[in-house]
Structure formats: C-alpha cells, structure tokens
C-alpha cells in the first residue's frame, strides 16, 4: 500500500468549499484504486488566521509543511485584508520558500462546456502554460520613498537570472517535447523591455538547441492575447514570465469557459520540497457560502497532484470521471448549469466508482 501525506490549506472564501469537494473525490479514488492511501492534515492558515494572529501563517509554517508529500491549496484573499498582505503572507512564501519555480497551468475545453470563442471546435484549445514562478516581476524587490508627499515614488523591480530563466526554459521545452505536437511558444516583451526580456529571448534560443525535435516560436505578450483569441489551434505549450503567464492563464481559463475549471500546479521539479496544487479562481467572496462554487478546477489540480505523486492511473481515472460528468451536463452556474458544488462532487464520485451518473 502506497501512502501519501497531504497538507490541506483551504484558506479563504470558497477555498474551504472546493477543498472539501477535492478531498471527497480523493477519498473516492482511494477506495476505487485500493492500492494507495492519502493521509490529510488540514491547516487553518489564511485571512481569518491573520485577523487573530497578525500573520497569515506561523513563523515555522514552511518547516511544518516540509514533512508532506504535497500541498493542496484552496484560495487566498479577503475583502477586509489588503491583497498584498494575503498573497505575500501565505501563497508566495510557500512557492518561493520551496522553490516551486515551475507553475504549470493546463487549459482545454471540457466536454459539455461551451467556450465563448465562436470558432473554437473540439480539440482547438488544448494548451499548457508554463509560468516562471520564482522571480521576474514578482521577485519582491522595490520600495517606496517620500510616502504621502507630492514627490512620492514607488519602484517594482523585475529580476531575471540566467539560472532562473534557463531552468524554466528547459522545463518548458521538455514538456513540449513530451506532448504530441512538440510545439512551444515563448512569450516575451523584448521590444520594450530591453534588458531582462532580451536575456530571456537569448536563453530561449540557447536552450532550444537541446531540443531539435521541438518547433518553437516567439510572440510579444500583447500579440499573444490576440493569437489566443483568434487562433487558439495554433498554440500548444506556452512559456512566459511570472506576470505575463499570470495574466495569460486567466485569459486561457476564461476562453475555455470559466476560471472555475482552471487548475495550476506549483512544482519543484527536483523534488527537494513538496509541490503545491490549487485552482486558479481565487477566493470569490461573491459566491462564498452559496454552495455553487465550481469544484472542477480543484478536481483537475488534484489529478495533477496524483500524477506528480506517481499515481497516473488514478489521475487519468479522475479526469475521465470529470469529463463524463461535464458531458452529461452536470455543471455549476458559471458554465451554464444548474447544479451545485455538492451535486457535481457526488456525480464525479459516482463516476469514479463506476456508477451510472445519467
């Protein structure tokens, strides 16, 4: 019996709702497979913890998480706590503290979900966006001077290192090489950002020589939004900086139908530390407590987690169950359905068990 220890951090907004759904589905997979077990410990870190303790997580939070095989994360952010506090107090310290430098965000149109793109047919939108997750625009360097005065100034410094850019390019090329189309698009803005982004382009060209079987091209980030919208079938694997990929992956989720179906994995490819898996939709306080949050993104990121742990059969079984459920029209309101979170979750669990969901 293979055993895994998972740290669950539901955190804020709809995070607890979708993580509860995800844990229910993982339990169903565990029962169906019969050859692995998942032991979960839940941490109450997040905005409520901050209001009580003045920090989003305890000082030894990373040390507590080191003993786990993976982290299952909900969402962070609250209306009454500044966003820079919630993000820099919990999610980013985990990503950067554990050097989860590869943020992997798959996107495709699931059966039964109608995308907003008029000319997008089956298979036309099937991408993986690789986001540099450790430096770039979110490196945390900068400051403010003369605060409150007319001459106040704020700086936000993007940091690009040869080590950081090389490893994310190599990861992206390897991923593209493993996918059927062997196609990679490198997103840049080197026409206007003439230092870090020019280095980014140069390193992409250097790394490409290691992968002669991968076809790659380069695209300015603003033009990339147009290409994603008008020619989705021309794309497959995409690599971009921390900020650019953050924006483009939200666009990708929307083009696939909803952020409620968009997952992400924060990976330490060297496996020195636990990797973290989460939906990208955020805390969504406008629907918190209504029971209508879409759990599909959480199921998909659970599949990413299972695959990372080596349970590929269980990951495939989970995604097959999700696609059976969406194809049957059991959908939450954000993708045009009338089902609630629990109904979708129960249907996926039944599909995993082999029951007839129709």
Curated annotation (Swiss-Prot):
Which pathway does the protein contribute to?
Answer: Carbohydrate acid metabolism; tartrate degradation; 2-hydroxy-3-oxosuccinate from L-tartrate: step 1/1; Carbohydrate acid metabolism; tartrate degradation; 2-hydroxy-3-oxosuccinate from meso-tartrate: step 1/1; Carbohydrate acid metabolism; tartrate degradation; D-glycerate from L-tartrate: step 1/1
Catalytic activities: tartrate + NAD(+) = 2-hydroxy-3-oxosuccinate + NADH + H(+); (2R,3S)-tartrate + NAD(+) = 2-hydroxy-3-oxosuccinate + NADH + H(+); (2R,3R)-tartrate + NAD(+) = 2-hydroxy-3-oxosuccinate + NADH + H(+); (2R,3R)-tartrate + H(+) = (R)-glycerate + CO2
Cofactor annotation: Mg(2+); Mn(2+); K(+)
Annotated PROSITE patterns: IDH_IMDH (PS00470)
As for what it does, the entry says: Has multiple catalytic activities. Apart from catalyzing the oxidation of (+)-tartrate to oxaloglycolate, also converts meso-tartrate to D-glycerate and catalyzes the oxidative decarboxylation of D-malate to pyruvate.
What note does UniProt attach to the cofactor annotation? Binds 1 Mg(2+) or Mn(2+) ion per subunit.
- GO CC aspect terms: cytoplasm
Gene designation: ttuC'
Q: What induces it?
A: By tartrate.
- Where is it localised? Cytoplasm
Its source organism is: Agrobacterium vitis (Rhizobium vitis)
The reply on keyword Cytoplasm is yes
Short name of one Pfam family for this protein? Iso_dh
This chain's protein is named Probable tartrate dehydrogenase/decarboxylase TtuC'
């Amino acid at each position: 019996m293979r055993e895994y220890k998972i740290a669950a951090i539901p955190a804020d907004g709809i995070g607890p709702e979708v993580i509860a759904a995800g844990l229910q589905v993982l339990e169903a997979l565990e029962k169906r497979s019969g050859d692995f077990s998942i032991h979960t410990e839940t941490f109450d870190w997040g905005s409520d913890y901050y209001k009580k303790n003045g920090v989003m997580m305890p000082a030894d939070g990373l040390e507590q998480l080191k003993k786990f095989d993976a982290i299952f994360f909900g969402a962070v952010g609250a209306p009454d706590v500044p966003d820079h506090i919630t993000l820099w107090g919990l999610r980013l310290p985990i990503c950067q503290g554990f050097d989860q430098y590869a943020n992997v965000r798959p996107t495709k149109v699931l059966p039964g979900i109608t995308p907003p793109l008029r000319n997008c047919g089956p298979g036309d939108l099937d991408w993986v966006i690789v986001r540099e997750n450790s430096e770039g625009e979110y490196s945390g360097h900068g400051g403010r001077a003369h605060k409150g005065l007319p001459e106040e100034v704020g700086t936000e410094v993007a940091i690009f290192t040869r080590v950081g850019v090389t490893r994310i390019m190599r990861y992206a090329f390897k991923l593209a090489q493993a996918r059927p189309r062997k196609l990679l698009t490198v997103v840049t803005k080197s026409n206007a950002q003439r230092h870090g982004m020019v280095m980014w382009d140069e390193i992409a060209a250097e790394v490409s020589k290691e992968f002669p079987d991968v076809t790659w091209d380069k695209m300015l980030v603003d033009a990339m939004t147009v290409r994603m919208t008008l020619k989705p079938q021309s794309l497959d694997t995409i690599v971009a900086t921390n900020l650019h990929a953050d924006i483009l992956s939200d666009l990708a989720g929307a083009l696939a139908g909803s952020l409620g179906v968009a997952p992400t994995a924060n990976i330490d490819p060297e496996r020195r530390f636990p990797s973290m898996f989460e939906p990208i939709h955020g805390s969504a306080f406008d629907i918190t407590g209504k029971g209508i949050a879409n759990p599909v993104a959480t199921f998909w990121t659970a599949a990413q987690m299972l695959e990372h742990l080596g349970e590929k059969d269980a990951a495939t079984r989970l995604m097959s169950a999700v696609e059976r459920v969406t194809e049957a029209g059991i959908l939450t309101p954000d993708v045009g359905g009338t089902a609630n979170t629990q109904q979708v979750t129960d249907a996926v669990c039944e599909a995993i068990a082999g029951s007839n969901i129709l």
